[in-house]
Amino acid sequence: YKRQTHTDNEHLSALQSLISREIPYDANTPIDSIISWTNRLAPTLKSPRTEESYFTLLLWQVSAYIMRGDLSLAIDRARYMYESAKDMNSSFGIALANQAIGQAYTASYIQDKALSSYLDALHHLSPNNPQTYRLLVKISTLLQQMNRLEEAMTYVKPLNQFLEQQPEHPLAIPILIENATYYISSGDQQTALRYLQKADSIYQNHTHEPAHEFSIDYYTAACYRALAADGHDKQKADEALALYNKLLKLVSGNKRSLEYRSISAEKIYLYKLLGRFDEACRIYQELYTVTDTLASKSYIRQINALKATYQIDELEPVSY
């Protein structure tokens, strides 16, 4: 029993370390461990006294399920988060449950509802709550994916001001990447690369986190791909391809994972750009099977049921 308690304490410390460093995983705490450890540890934290730890741990677990490609389990967990928050009359819990719902919608490409969930989450958090900054990053990312760039920048500006005050904050790299992606989408690749180089400098000199390296490489490749498209620059296309292949090697163990699918989709665009249509088609067929389409419809039904529950509950008077 003592040995189990010691192990549980070590696992909880490892998970809390991920949360404090604002990273989804690390070399010692991979995705599968986050899921299994949280299943064991979260129930021990389910009380008003430890509600922040409890709901944040569950949020990290939802992210882990999404990254692993288990969207159905992520949706179930988001539903459980919301029900727990309601049972505990926890405004903080409802905020994080909404963020989890938003992440599940984002992964399902239901962007309007994802945005609505994120804004609901923001409504339940005070402006100076540390969770607010992470949420602003997610809202900016989503708005950029929706091509609502100027709206996205209204969320990036307070993040930039926050970063000026706390340049070594754990969200520094995600905030710099938000700036970079804005400039990639705006067609200013040189400015985007400058932000990515700043992020890389923090990674090289301070964080050394695999998740940070992955994000920096992914968006640097996107920048190179845009440069290749704008200037028909084959060298940049080759550099982008080399980065995508490097990243795919890291995630090829699970072809259902969000990262594998995102990078494969980027490779499709790149191959089309290079006129390598057969290779683009091969990847497309691997990614988009009939089974997957059916699964996607099932996810959408699940997620709509979850949001419907939330909207009905919203009409009930709740005292915090």
Where are these regions (language model features)?
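Amphipathic alpha-helical segments of tetratricopeptide repeats
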Residues: R3, N39-K46, R79-K86, D120-H124, ...
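Hydrophobic positions within repeat-based interaction scaffolds
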Residues: R3-Q4, D32, D238, N254-Y320
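Residue signature of alpha-solenoid helical repeat architecture, marking inter-repeat boundaries
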Residues: N9-S13, E52, F92, P130, ...
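Residue register of alpha-helical TPR repeats
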Residues: S13-S17, T56, L96, R134-L136, ...
